[in-house]
């Protein structure tokens, strides 16, 4: 509920009878005087279920309206109502972006009614009569509807109609110079100088903004047109040069086309020449054919006598050959008969020799047998003597040897099993030793490695981060774009600062990958996030300058900011500054005194604390400040835990000691295993020595067994030899007892019979030799006659062969020429030439006839000459530029050149027109802007003298109109230079003072119907606040100025007031009358609404 003066005491006095005198006048509701309101100013605002209000009304002054009240009572709700009620965007307020969030809790519908003073500038708006003094705009916000309902004078309209009305009234809710909410004060300080000029012009004279926009547009058009014109002029020069080149190419092309025409004409002439050449060749072929035919007939006539003689000789050779065959048979039979006699004689001679040998054998047989018997008997006796001397080993000896051999084999098997067991144990120990050695090497390497990726093996939830880091390392394109986590790339100078850093950086950020810019984020974020569940942090351009200098921090008892004791990748450190604010956290390894801590939690003169978080000793202190009421400050602290992260080295000293101890233990284990292995090796050597001894014993036994086997083998062989000699001796004795004298006599008789048979055969052979001689003589005579006849036949064959070869050759020539002449009469080539000739039109034939007649007269109408002409033309044409596109390009260049020569003068005129318009608009804008800014600067300087050292407003006018800007220059110390107002150089209170004074300086020049400033005095000290308040009151309450709204949560004593200003005190509480129950109470305390009759 809003109130100006509490009239309750007057009502109470009447009820108690303290003033019972009859009165001639009584209090009644007064009708407001609207004549003092400027067109477009706000007369009244009525709110229902809006933010903190259930139902309230603001009846406003046409000059300064100062809205005061405690924090949370609903002062800024008035600002929200003005913005949203006039169809403004929630962004202009700087709070929630959803309109439905402004509906009071527990309600579904909210209503804003704003009554404005009508203006002559309002035209063509439905439901608004120019005769009406006021315009009522109603906005109904429903939680369940996306769009609000709007009414003008209780008639429903669209939002665009309301926005049109607001624009016609020159209400600029998006202009920080007119509408500055509490949340957008800092935005005004960050407002760029170019934008500040635009907003200032809009507040004062919107028509000048149109001129500025036109100048910017004209300048852009001028630059674009000038660039285009320069390009076209250069293009004209280029095209003219290109045109000259193309004309030469066209001339070459015409020469090419002429030669091409000649080539085409001679190509068409070729069929005629070829037909002529073909006919000439055909006549030559016919003459050759006739000659071949005559030659063939002549050779056949010469061949006939020789053929008859050949036939007679062939008959004679045949008869003699038959006779020779018969004589040869007779001769062979006689020769065969003699051969048979020879064979019989040879057989008889062999038999005689054989019989004689048998006689000799039988005559000397008895002596030989006796000698053999004596020799065999001697061998037999000698073998018996040797056998008697040989001692055969006993069977038990061999059995003893077998037993000893089995014992040795069993013993060897046992020892080999033991050796196998030792080898198995040794292999296992070797495997363990290699494993221990690898572990020791790995741990030794971990003590010296610089790669911190091992940190990611400490926890299971870091496995995804480790895999993501490895993938980034495998992709060179991600290098310097995706940075590894802070726990790998950043370290503190010692363990205590590492614990500080771990306490201030949340765990998700400590393991997050840093993306250096938005382009890299767009390029690589999805490939990483699709594969791994990791966090990404994108670097921004946010400022990371510490809030106060390092010297101040040290004066307060700290060693510096936490960021001062951190090293590593600068970009990752910047990310930690932006996300965890480590550049704003002062640290001290010793604990601060209570007095030092009390000083830190005490707000500064501007009401704000210096640091929101500090670290001292082993405590982290968060200092929080309430946003409402007295803005109470309360600290909370927590103990700082030790961490394994952010260490200067990859591992802590404890980890190093632990790993070194593990390495020592591994070495001891390795030596123990080695000792065991040495013992096993010695044991194995003993077993191998035993095997060697057993092998030696086995060799001795084998040698003994071999010797015994050899004795047994020799005994058996000797016994067998004796038996064989005995049998042989018996056989010889039997043979010696036989009588062979009769056998010798029989063989002598057989020899006599054979010699008689031999004499008979020799007599028969003499007779056969005589017959053979006669047959041979007759055969030789017949063979001579046959040879002579065959020689004559062979000679005749040579003669006939010559005639046959000649005949075949001539016949082949005849057939070939006959066939060739037949084929040449109508060849496919000849037909194609004729078809081509017939395809020519009459004009072509006439042209060709003229050329042919010319060549015929010159004696050159032949294929060779025409072909030479074609070859020459083709050689010449190959040297000629025949780019057929040259004509087209020349036409295009000519057309383009003609068009450019036509358009360039017109563009030059247009450019001059634009330049003239620029000059004209510049002459209009610059003096007015200079005058406005000069007046604003003078006004601002006068106002600023009361709170600071000096202030000024400058209009910067570079060549580019888009860069024209206003710069607010201030200084708060006499020896300091003027500096531009921005969000970095000045403190919050200094920015607030500068901002409000600039807005006050605009007051008398602005054309806006009203201006709103919400809690601009935050951060000011009481002196500056009084000075600013006085300046604001004096300017806002001056004549012919726009309506002004100032919202503030505090009200100092001794402020300057003016009779035209109105104070609206916003109060809340259970004791406040409820206007929903008693509608009259909504006007309770508003003295401006009462009059006395």
Curated annotation (Swiss-Prot):
Q: Which GO terms describe its cellular component?
A: chromosome, telomeric region; nucleus; Smc5-Smc6 complex
Which GO molecular function terms does the record list? Answer: ATP binding; ATP hydrolysis activity; damaged DNA binding; single-stranded DNA binding
- Where does this protein have coiled-coil stretches? 208-354, 404-441, 651-757, 884-926
Q: Name one Pfam family in it.
A: SMC_N
Under InterPro entries, the record lists: P-loop_NTPase, RecF/RecN/SMC_N
Entry keyword annotation includes Nucleus: yes
- Localization per Swiss-Prot or TrEMBL: Nucleus; Chromosome
The yes or no answer to whether the keyword Cell inner membrane is present is: no
Keywords, comma-separated and alphabetical: ATP-binding, Chromosome, Coiled coil, DNA damage, DNA recombination, DNA repair, Nucleotide-binding, Nucleus, Ubl conjugation
The written remark on domains in the entry is: The flexible hinge domain, which separates the large intramolecular coiled coil regions, allows the heterotypic interaction with the corresponding domain of smc6, forming a V-shaped heterodimer.
- Which miscellaneous remark does the UniProt record hold? Present with 892 molecules/cell in log phase SD medium.
**Protein family:** Belongs to the SMC family. SMC5 subfamily.
- Spell out the subunit comment: Component of the Smc5-Smc6 complex which consists of KRE29, MMS21, NSE1, NSE3, NSE4, NSE5, SMC5 and SMC6.
Please give the name of this protein.
Answer: Structural maintenance of chromosomes protein 5
């Amino acid at each position: 509920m809003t109130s100006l003066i509490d009239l309750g005491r007057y009502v109470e006095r009447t009820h108690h009878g303290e003033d019972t005198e009859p009165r001639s006048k009584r209090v009644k509701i007064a009708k407001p005087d609207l004549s003092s309101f400027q067109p477009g100013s706000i007369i009244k605002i009525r709110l229902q279920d809006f933010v903190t209000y259930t139902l309230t009304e603001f009846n406003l002054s046409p000059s300064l309206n100062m809205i005061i009240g405690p924090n949370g009572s609903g002062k800024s709700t008035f600002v929200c109502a003005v913005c949203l009620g006039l169809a403004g965007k929630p962004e202009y307020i700087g709070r929630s972006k959803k309109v439905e969030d402004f509906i009071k809790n527990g309600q579904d519908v909210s209503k804003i009614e704003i009554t404005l003073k009508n203006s002559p500038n309002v035209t063509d708006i439905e439901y608004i009569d120019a005769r009406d003094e006021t315009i009522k705009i109603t906005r109904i916000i429903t939680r369940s509807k996306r769009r609000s309902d709007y009414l003008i004078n209780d008639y429903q309209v669209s939002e665009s109609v309301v926005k049109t009305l607001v624009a016609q009234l020159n209400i600029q809710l998006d202009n920080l110079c007119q509408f500055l909410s509490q949340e957008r004060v800092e935005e005004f300080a960050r407002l760029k100088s170019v934008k500040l000029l635009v907003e200032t012009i809009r507040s004062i004279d919107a028509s000048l903004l149109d001129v500025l926009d036109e100048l910017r547009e004209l300048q852009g058009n001028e630059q674009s047109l000038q660039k285009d014109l320069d390009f076209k002029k250069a293009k004209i020069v280029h095209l003219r040069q290109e045109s000259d080149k193309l004309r030469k190419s066209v001339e070459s092309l015409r020469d090419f086309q002429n030669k091409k025409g000649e080539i085409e004409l001679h190509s068409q002439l070729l069929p005629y020449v070829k037909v002529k050449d073909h006919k000439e060749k055909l006549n030559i072929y016919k003459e050759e054919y006739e000659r071949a035919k005559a030659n063939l007939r002549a050779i056949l006539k010469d061949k006939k006598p020789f053929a008859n003689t050949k036939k007679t000789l062939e008959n004679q050779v045949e008869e003699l050959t038959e006779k020779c065959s018969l004589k040869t048979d007779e001769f062979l039979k006689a020769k065969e008969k003699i051969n048979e006699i020879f064979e019989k004689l040879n057989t008889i001679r062999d038999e005689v020799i054989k019989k004689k040998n048998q006689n000799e054998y039988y005559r000397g047989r008895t002596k030989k047998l006796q000698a053999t018997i004596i020799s065999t008997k001697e061998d037999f006796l000698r073998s018996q003597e040797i056998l008697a001397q040989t001692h055969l080993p006993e069977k038990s000896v061999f059995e003893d040897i077998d037993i000893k051999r089995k014992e040795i084999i069993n013993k060897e098997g046992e020892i080999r099993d033991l050796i196998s067991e030792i080898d198995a144990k040794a292999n296992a120990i070797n495997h363990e030793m290699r494993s221990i050695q690898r572990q020791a090497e790995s741990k030794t390497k971990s003590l010296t490695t610089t790669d911190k990726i091992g940190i990611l093996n400490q926890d299971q939830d870091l496995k995804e981060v480790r895999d993501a880091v490895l993938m980034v390392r495998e992709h060179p394109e991600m290098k310097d774009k995706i940075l590894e986590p802070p726990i790998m790339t950043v370290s503190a100078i010692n363990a205590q600062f590492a614990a500080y850093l771990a306490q201030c950086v949340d765990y998700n950020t400590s393991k997050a990958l840093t993306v250096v810019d938005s382009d890299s984020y767009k390029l690589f974020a999805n490939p990483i996030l699709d594969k791994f569940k990791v966090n990404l942090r994108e670097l921004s351009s946010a400022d990371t300058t510490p809030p106060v200098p390092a010297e101040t921090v040290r004066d307060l008892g700290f060693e510096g900011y936490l960021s001062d004791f951190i090293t590593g990748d600068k970009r990752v450190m910047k990310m930690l500054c932006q996300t965890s604010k480590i550049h704003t956290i002062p640290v001290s390894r010793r604990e601060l005194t209570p007095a030092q801590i009390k000083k830190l939690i005490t707000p500064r003169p501007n009401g704000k604390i210096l640091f929101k978080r500090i670290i001292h000793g082993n405590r982290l202190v968060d200092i929080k400040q309430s946003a409402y009421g007295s803005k109470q400050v309360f600290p909370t602290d927590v103990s700082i835990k030790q961490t394994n992260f952010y260490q200067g080295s990859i591992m802590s000293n404890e980890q190093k000691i632990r790993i070194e101890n593990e390495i020592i233990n591994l070495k001891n284990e390795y030596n123990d295993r080695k000792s065991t292995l040495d013992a096993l090796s010695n044991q194995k050597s003993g077993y191998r020595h035993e095997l060697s001894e057993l092998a030696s014993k086995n060799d001795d036994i084998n040698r003994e067994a071999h010797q015994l086997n050899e004795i047994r083998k020799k005994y058996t062989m000797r016994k067998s030899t004796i038996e064989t000699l005995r049998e042989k001796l018996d056989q010889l004795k039997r043979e010696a007892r036989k009588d062979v004298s009769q056998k010798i006599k029989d063989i002598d008789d057989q020899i006599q019979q054979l010699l008689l048979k031999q004499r008979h055969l020799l007599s028969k052979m003499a007779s056969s030799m005589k017959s053979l001689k006669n047959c041979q003589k007759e055969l030789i005579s017949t063979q001579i006659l046959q040879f002579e006849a065959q020689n004559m036949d062979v000679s005749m064959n040579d003669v006939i062969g010559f005639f046959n070869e000649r005949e075949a050759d001539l016949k082949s020539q005849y057939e070939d020429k006959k066939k060739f002449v037949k084929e040449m009469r109508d060849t496919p080539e000849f037909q194609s030439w004729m078809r081509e000739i017939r395809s020519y039109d009459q004009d072509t034939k006439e042209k060709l006839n003229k050329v042919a007649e010319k060549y015929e007269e010159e004696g050159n109408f032949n294929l060779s000459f025409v072909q030479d002409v074609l070859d020459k033309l083709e050689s010449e044409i190959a040297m000629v530029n025949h780019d057929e596109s040259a004509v087209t390009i020349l036409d295009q260049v000519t057309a383009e050149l003609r068009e450019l020569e036509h358009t360039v003068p017109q563009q030059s005129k247009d450019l001059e027109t634009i330049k003239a318009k620029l000059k004209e608009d510049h002459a209009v804008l610059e003096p007015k802007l200079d005058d406005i800014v000069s007046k604003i600067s003078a006004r601002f300087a006068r106002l600023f003298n009361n709170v600071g050292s000096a202030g000024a407003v400058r209009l910067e006018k570079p060549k580019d109109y888009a860069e024209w800007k206003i710069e607010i220059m201030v200084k708060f110390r006499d020896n300091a230079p003027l500096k531009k107002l921005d969000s970095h150089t000045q403190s919050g209170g200094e920015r607030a003072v500068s901002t409000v004074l600039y807005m006050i300086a605009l007051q008398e020049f602005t054309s806006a119907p009203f201006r709103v400033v919400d809690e601009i005095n935050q951060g000011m000290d009481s002196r500056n606040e009084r000075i600013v308040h006085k300046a604001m009151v004096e300017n806002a309450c001056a004549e012919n100025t726009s309506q002004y709204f100032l919202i503030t949560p505090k009200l100092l004593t001794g402020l300057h007031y003016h009779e035209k200003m109105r104070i609206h005190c916003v109060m809340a509480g259970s004791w406040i009358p409820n206007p929903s129950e008693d509608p009259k109470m909504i006007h309770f305390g508003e003295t401006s609404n009462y009059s006395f009759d």
